[in-house]
Structures are given as C-alpha cells and as structure tokens.
Amino acid sequence: MDIAHDLQSIGAQEQALVFPHFDPARAWALGNRMHALAASRGHAVAIDIATFGHPLFFSALPGATPDNADWVRRKRNVVAHFRRSSYAIGLRMQQAGTTLTDKHGLPLAEYAPHGGAFPLTVAGAGVIGSVTVSGLPQRLDHEFVVETLCAELGQDYGVLALARS
C-alpha cells in the first residue's frame, strides 16, 4: 500500500461523492442499500448515517457487537472534527509518524482514525455529516462505504476504488 497514492485517491473520492441534496428519506434509502449489500456478503458490520448531531440510520447486522457501535461513534467523531474521511486522517497520521493525541490532543477513546467513516457532502452546503461502517478491516470498511456511495450516486466504483493492496 502506497500511503501517498491512497491519500490522493481518497481525496478524489471525497471530491466526487457529493449529493445534490440529502434528507432523511435519502439516508434511509442509502442505509437500506448498505444493509442489503452487507447482508448479501455476510458482513458482520454496524452501519451509521448521521448529520452532525442527528442520527438518521443505524443497523447492526448479525455478528456485529457493541464494540462496532463504539468504533462507529469514534470514527464519526474524526469526520466531524476534520471534515475528511477517517481513513485519510489515519493515513496522514501514519505518514507523519504521529497520532491524533500527540498532534491534535484528541483522545483515542473519543476519536478513531481508522477506515470506515466518510464525509456526507452536499453540493453548496459542504460536509453535513458522515456515513460510517465498522466490522471489517479498516481499508475494507472504507471501501465498502465508497462502493455503496458510488452505487447511490451513479458513480463508477471501478474508477474511484483504492488500488488493491
């Protein structure tokens, strides 16, 4: 895995995956799409869609644990703080050889710079929340979110997917 290349690719994902509008009905549709895909693949994940301070969708598939819900919360906090995907922030910390605590004073009990939380961006409004998955290895959590956002927004996942590691 080339961190610099992944960071560039994640930046392209964040630029491309923008909703023209977003409301609770769209959150429900996206959440159900994610749930159905995760169930079809046998993924034991927790799925969360929220605007900042307002939960819109949550689902825990069979095999997901309360730990997954806590990871969701901590990853979501990273997006809320940085307005970037949690995976991008984690890779930036890895690249710099530091941690969120050392660099930004953010406690790891509240912030998880691991893949799986992606900014929910609306054209003309910016980042309004996050779409988060927890239960797979972090790169796969991130890519699962990107794949389903691509499907929801009519984007070509093959173009936006991270390089295979």
Curated annotation (Swiss-Prot):
Pfam families: HbpS-like. Signal peptide: none annotated. It comes from Burkholderia multivorans (strain ATCC 17616 / 249). This is UPF0303 protein Bmul_1674/BMULJ_01570. The lineage of its organism: Bacteria, Pseudomonadati, Pseudomonadota, Betaproteobacteria, Burkholderiales. Belongs to the UPF0303 family. HAMAP family: UPF0303. InterPro entries: PduO/GlcC-like, PduO/GlcC-like_sf, YBR137W-like.
